[in-house]
Amino acid sequence: MEIILANPRGFCAGVHRAISIVDRALDIFTPPIYVRHEVVHNQYVVDDLRARGAVFVEELDEVPENSIVIFSAHGVAQSVRAEAKRRDLKIFDATCPLVTKVHMEVTRASRRGQECILIGHQGHPEVVGTMGQYDNPQGGIYLIESPEDIKKLEVKNPNSLCFSSQTTLSVDDTANIIKALREKFPKIDGPRKDDICYATQNRQDAVKALAERSDLVLVVGSTNSSNSNRLQEKASCVGVNAYLIDSEKDIKTEWLENVKVVGVTAGASAPEVLVKEVIARLKKLGGTVVTENLGVEENIIFEVPAELRIKQID
């Protein structure tokens, strides 16, 4: 049984930055360090940081006064920032810069009084944070998840309207929604550059190429990871069996029956150590040759805050 690895896979620049912020804060300051929401959607990463002294909370009222708190990679609403400032909490912001770009789009629309449509998944923390950038009662912000939502959408002024997107959606699905938006609202403004992040696009392209060569695809990632779920969907659309797994322990031997080629990829929040463990398990189950697809080289780096760029000397 051949094992093929997708390329690129795993951590993106935004995830690297977010984890590094928590990691360095734990090294520099005395724990506990509070993190609002899971810093990234991966159980392995969260458990590792928790063991080192990170305390994950959902709301700031769980954080003691004068504590250090880190905002997750998904971003937060303006009301959360205001509360943190009011309570004199020391903040480190791990919001992905590409999410911040979408926040700025929505903020500009709010200041102009232009209504905004956000394409995203209800309840996802990135969506909650992005919706929370809009605060102009003269306008409005609306969440849509599918072309069907657009049919029943009513806005105040279709001539002053823009749209933005959650960064981790399927590129193809977003294209269909945008097409429907432009058909209903011909004057709608869109971002100058697609909101779907480079890493999401690259990993979706890579998993499609992987699925075309595979009899089975395993996507390493947690079930609450939007981008990991999209990878599993993309592989399935090619016509192969595809499963989302948290770790090698989730692999079922019956999946491998009559499989000659198994493809492996990982969501943007899944560490490479989990991929290596999956490969090791597959080898025990009959895997032999391990190869890696050619893919896009990613060399983007997002810097951590200046206060955390301190070299530790033992």
UniProtKB/Swiss-Prot annotation:
(2E)-4-hydroxy-3-methylbut-2-enyl diphosphate binds at residues 41, 74, 124, 167, 225-227, 269. The keyword Nucleus does not apply. GO terms for molecular function: 4 iron, 4 sulfur cluster binding; 4-hydroxy-3-methylbut-2-enyl diphosphate reductase activity; metal ion binding. The active site is at residue 126. Its cofactor is [4Fe-4S] cluster. Binds 1 [4Fe-4S] cluster per subunit. Dimethylallyl diphosphate binds at residues 41, 74, 124, 225-227, 269. It catalyses: isopentenyl diphosphate + 2 oxidized [2Fe-2S]-[ferredoxin] + H2O = (2E)-4-hydroxy-3-methylbut-2-enyl diphosphate + 2 reduced [2Fe-2S]-[ferredoxin] + 2 H(+); dimethylallyl diphosphate + 2 oxidized [2Fe-2S]-[ferredoxin] + H2O = (2E)-4-hydroxy-3-methylbut-2-enyl diphosphate + 2 reduced [2Fe-2S]-[ferredoxin] + 2 H(+). Keywords: 4Fe-4S, Iron, Iron-sulfur, Isoprene biosynthesis, Metal-binding, Oxidoreductase. One of its GO terms (biological process) is terpenoid biosynthetic process. Isopentenyl diphosphate binds at residues 41, 74, 124, 225-227, 269. Its EC number is 1.17.7.4. Pathway: Isoprenoid biosynthesis; dimethylallyl diphosphate biosynthesis; dimethylallyl diphosphate from (2E)-4-hydroxy-3-methylbutenyl diphosphate: step 1/1; Isoprenoid biosynthesis; isopentenyl diphosphate biosynthesis via DXP pathway; isopentenyl diphosphate from 1-deoxy-D-xylulose 5-phosphate: step 6/6. [4Fe-4S] cluster binds at residues 12, 96, 197. Catalyzes the conversion of 1-hydroxy-2-methyl-2-(E)-butenyl 4-diphosphate (HMBPP) into a mixture of isopentenyl diphosphate (IPP) and dimethylallyl diphosphate (DMAPP). Acts in the terminal step of the DOXP/MEP pathway for isoprenoid precursor biosynthesis. Belongs to the IspH family. PANTHER family: 4-HYDROXY-3-METHYLBUT-2-ENYL DIPHOSPHATE REDUCTASE. This is 4-hydroxy-3-methylbut-2-enyl diphosphate reductase. It comes from Psychromonas ingrahamii (strain DSM 17664 / CCUG 51855 / 37).
